[in-house]
């Protein structure tokens, strides 16, 4: 009965009244107010200096990182037999290591909070607040310590990493260059997330990191490829420059995995809009796609838009896109196995 209830994170922005209805004495801290925990709990370590990375040690067995995924082990076994790496690479492409931020061998670094965008459907800004970058020295301190601990895969976390530095006089490419130099190019960095428009604006400066494989992954959510839908989402209706960047990555075979997210069933979406999105996905050749059914969020601009797509139709449209994606993944894995076996046979013949 003497315990104190503290509710924070995104919930206070959406459910404050409900929380207080259940627990009138609860302390409510908005996301931007989390530093107040220092005083509430008499913290020995200030909140602002706490690392985002939740796993301080490599997961290991007999001093070697292991993975219990049977499919991945099969791919690795075929690679060993064929003296190649096609199958494991194809596995990473076809699954995108979907939950790689949960992998024990990755080191996560929070580099920014919030998003400068104003998408009509998004509640992130309400829950987290205005965009702000994390101090670069603090980021590099974590990066250096991660290297010392033996990590070589780092994930930059944030709601909009592409905007990093705009409020503190630096840029994402400058941060990446510093990381590259510090690791002597021996580490890899994954970016979660970067807005398509920002990626386009930074593309010329980012290409070298894609080409070298230093940036081995990024997630950039297009949400839709329909100008009409994008306009209602309060996003740039011209997705073509972004598609051309993705095509350039594909043409040059840059070793970077491309991940996107789409929303199906946004108010006003019609079948032609879905086809435009599918065509964009085909052209971009993303290695992984998250398909989300639209659902309104209270207090957002889209909350008042009339829903025009039934739940049944949303599920059908999402299933259509998902099925196409699965066919692509299967073809990719089969081609990788075939290539490995043919290369192995050729080496044996020689």
Task: Please name every model-derived segment.
Residues 34-38, 136, 140, 173, ...:
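Short, amphipathic alpha-helical "lid/cap" segments that border enzyme active or binding sites
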Residues 164, 185-187, 301-319:
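Short acidic, glycine/proline-enriched helix-loop-strand junctions
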């Amino acid at each position: 009965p003497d315990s104190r209830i503290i509710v924070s994170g995104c919930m206070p922005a959406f459910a404050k009244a409900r929380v207080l209805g259940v627990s009138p004495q609860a302390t409510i801290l908005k996301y931007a107010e989390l530093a107040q925990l220092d005083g509430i709990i008499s913290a020995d370590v200030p909140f602002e200096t706490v690392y985002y990375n939740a796993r301080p040690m490599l997961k290991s067995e007999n001093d070697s990182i292991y993975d219990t995924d049977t499919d991945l082990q099969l791919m690795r076994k075929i690679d060993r037999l064929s003296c190649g790496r096609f199958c494991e690479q194809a596995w990473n492409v076809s699954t995108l290591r979907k939950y790689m931020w949960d992998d024990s061998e990755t080191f996560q670094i929070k580099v920014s909070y919030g998003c400068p965008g104003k998408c009509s459907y998004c509640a992130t800004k309400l829950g987290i607040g205005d965009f702000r970058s994390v101090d670069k020295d603090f980021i590099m301190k974590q990066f250096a310590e991660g290297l010392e601990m033996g990590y070589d895969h780092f994930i930059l976390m944030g709601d909009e990493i592409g905007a990093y530095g705009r409020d503190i006089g630096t840029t994402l490419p400058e941060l990446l260059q510093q990381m590259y130099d510090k690791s002597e190019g021996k580490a890899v960095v994954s970016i979660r997330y970067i807005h398509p428009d920002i990626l386009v604006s930074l593309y010329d400066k980012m290409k070298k990191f894609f080409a070298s494989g230093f940036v081995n992954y990024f997630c950039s959510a297009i949400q839709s490829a329909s100008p009409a839908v994008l306009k209602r989402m309060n996003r740039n209706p011209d997705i073509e420059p972004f598609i051309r960047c993705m095509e350039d990555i594909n043409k040059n075979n840059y070793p970077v995995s491309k991940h996107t997210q789409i929303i199906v069933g946004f108010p006003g979406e019609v079948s032609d809009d879905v086809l435009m999105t599918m065509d964009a996905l085909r052209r971009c050749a993303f290695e992984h796609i998250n398909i989300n059914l639209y659902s309104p969020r209270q207090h957002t601009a889209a909350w008042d838009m009339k829903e025009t797509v039934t739940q049944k139709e949303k599920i059908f449209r999402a299933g259509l896109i998902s099925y196409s994606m699965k066919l692509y993944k299967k073809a990719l894995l089969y081609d990788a196995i075939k290539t490995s076996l043919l290369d192995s046979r050729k080496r044996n013949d020689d």
